[in-house]
Amino acid sequence: MGSITHNKGNQIKKKLDSFIGISNWESLSIEHDNINHQLDITLLAIIKDITNKPDYSSCTTTTTTTTITTNNNNNNNNNNVNKNEDNSNTTNNNLIKSINKEVENSSVNNNGFISMNQQKQNYHYNIPTSLKDIKSIIIKSQKLKGQLQSLKQVFKQNIIINNQEVIEQQVDAIKQQQQQQQEQQQEQEQEQQQQQDGESISLSSSTSSGITISSLSNIEYNPSIAFKLGKEFVIGNLFIDQIILFLEFLYGIALEIETNLQYWESIEPTIYYLQKSPLFWLKYYHQQLNRRIQFSNKFSELHNLKQPKPILYISNLLNKVNSFILNKQPSSQQVEQQQQQQQERDEQQQQQQQQQQQQQQHNNSHHHHHHRNENEKKKKSKRIKHPKIELLDKIQKLKSYQVVISVIIGRLTFLLDSLKINTNNNNNNNNTADNNNNNLNDNESIKRFSELMSKSSIIIFDSLLLFNELFKKNKESNDNDKKVDDDDELIKLSKDLINEIINIRNEDGDQQQQQQQQQQQQQQQQQQQQQQQQQQQQSLQLLNFKILLNNQNLINKLMEVMVKRLSGNLSIPNVFIRNWVKLSVGSVIVFFGIKYSYDNFDSFKQSAFDIRDAFIRFYHEHLEEPLLNIWNVIRYDKKSLQLADPASLQSSIDSLGRMVIDYNIDRNHLDINSTETRQHLFQLASRGDISSIMKSYESNIRSPLQNILFGDMIRLILIQIQKEKVDVDKAMVAIDKLLQANELNFQLLAAIPSAIFLALLIWQIKKLFTNQKKTLPYSQLVIFQTLRKINRTLILNNTQDQQNNNLPNFISPLLLTQINILNYSTIINNQDNNNNINNINNNNNNNNNQLIKTQFKPFEKYGTILISTNKLRSHQRFVRENTESQWFNQDVHDLESEALSNQDKIQTINRMFQTYSFLKNIK
């Protein structure tokens, strides 16, 4: 998930912690106000779980004592909470109880996904392998729901605290501190006069500072105040956690939808036709024949025509087939009906022992069973679509899901930013106040935050309604005969929730007017007004908790429905469905291959041994021996390449010299006793110079036949042959020296081809068992495509009307604004101009088009960019260079910023293409 959302959530939590002002909650371990102490223990356990968790974002380095997250909390002690309801009979509590009944007993048509009876269900469902990444998010959401359910009795408990007494305690503590400082100064003056040791001075200062700290921290020691502020602390943190978890789930679903959409858009219709099984085509053409026969029957009846015999024959066959199919169905239907009747009887017996609320729930469940039966019948009679139309429907559904998810991500991210701005404004206002009024300012900040939280909860509820409307539209497109009522029970539930907020806000406004009129009255009346104001705040707190729990139930149900939808028809088919033709043909080939090998087992065995011997020979000759020779050359300088023997060359040279000397002696050309002449001729012959016998060879060649028979012609020829042999041996020795000098190169040339072949073989085998989506080239391609998509989105939106593309200054509901609620826009709107949540126009029904332009299209663009940047961050780990990784993170943060214009973001993308090396090498 994007770090921008994590950073915003952490900032809001830190501001909320500064409003609360309590870092030690151990005072909740003390019994107080005659309430069940188990509630304090439950609240303290959840607060400890919240404060002990790290921040969301790993990129933030600052840590505080209130780093908060509650996603992984699992409180086993929460199941032992005893029920202890408040006995107060105020009008606000009666309203809350009545709304609670309506919320628990409300449900929605089966067209959507929302059902308020899901609190009793366990959302343990199978998650496909393609959605395993969001499994942890679903588990965190379920744990968050368990936390909220364990806090029901805690938020029903009301405590009245006198704020004036707390302020007086702080004023007294400040006075005591001033008196202690004066006494300390006097003691120091006396000690200086008496010239005492410095150790006593340090001891006195340390004791006085300890008294000051204890006097200033009286709020942390008051269990009543800690219980009240603890509920605000918990509900605020759980609210932020709910938004973060919802956004994490939407980001994961958006990536899954994008991958599925890319697959269905890239697939060719012919390939999709081949993916369909023969049974599907039989059903499809059976349906088409039925429709043709029905049309021909009606046409012939209307025009009083006789049908031809082939059509009659085919219609009779189809009637027999249809009757055979229909005769099999009642048995299964009867079994299902009997099982349903038994379940209904068991439910009726249990419901007779319960209260009227459970009877209403039974009626709702019976209503759901009735709708289920109708849906089953419609599914059986559902028309089978052609694969081409089915493919277009899948693409259309995925695109509609993508648009709605982009809008909701943009709206919720903008909502977090609005909460951050408002909390910062509240904090700035508190910093300008006096020190004596900090507690009052913190109470006002907490009250304003609770109001913002109630408004934001309505925005979240409205986002869930968008999904519900989307699912109903998809079902309407499939079931044309089914009509959906506009005023369904979900809209009634939204009316009840908003009317409750209106009533509480009205009572709150009346109470504020009464307080302004009674400011000059006595202190007892002021205390009563403060108590009434606290009751109103606690009722608003309880309402926020109920809406928060309601939204969490709906979010869990949405997660279940989205996972089922994306793992069903809209998901990418598995390997067996995609390649069933190849697998079937391959299995046939394998079968005949096994049969042939069994029939010719001996020849197959012999060929297998031959192939094995060939691989062994290849390994020894082309891998093992060249590598060993390379090692011998490098390590031992061992020469293995040699063509001629140097000793043989020397013997040939000596033989040639002796031949030349003997010939010269025989022909009296040389003195026998002259050693110097002999050595001279021998040296000339060893160098290849036989000029001493060439004159005799020239004279003998004049009469070759005579000299061959009676002369020295043959002897001279043999001497020349010996001379040529010596020359050849010298050349071979020279070649040996050249080979030995380049022996390492020759061995490398012998080993490289086989090594390359083996490396390619290993690479192909490794490629079969590795996921290509986790490689660097794939990540580079994804980053390139994502940046292109962002650039295209910004350019297309930049060419349109600029006013309709910029984010608005406020956020308002989309579906809830179409409900006619009295005084909704005047009461829900915050009177302060700094608040930019839920500022709705008065004429909502007349401004639907303007609402879509201002509250839908800009957030769709913003959400699309956020989804794309989240995808960039998921592939950022493949950017190996540290400097480029830091720059890449900064550029992605600039693309996520809502402060930059479209032109600035386009320039950022151009800079990214020109800067990063991994984007330049993509072909």
Curated annotation (Swiss-Prot):
The chain crosses the membrane at residues 745-765, 808-828. GO terms for cellular component: mitochondrial outer membrane. Residues 364-385 have a biased composition (Basic residues). InterPro entries: NCA2 (IPR013946). Residues 69-93, 182-208, 335-385 are annotated as: Disordered. Residues 349-363 have a biased composition (Low complexity). SUPFAM superfamilies: beta-sandwich domain of Sec23/24. It is found in: Mitochondrion membrane. The keyword Transport does not apply. It is a multi-pass membrane protein. Keywords: Membrane, Mitochondrion, Transmembrane, Transmembrane helix. Involved in the mitochondrial expression of subunits 6 and 8 of the F0-F1 ATP synthase. Belongs to the NCA2 family. This is Nuclear control of ATPase protein 2. The lineage of its organism: Eukaryota, Amoebozoa, Evosea, Eumycetozoa, Dictyostelia. The gene is nca2.
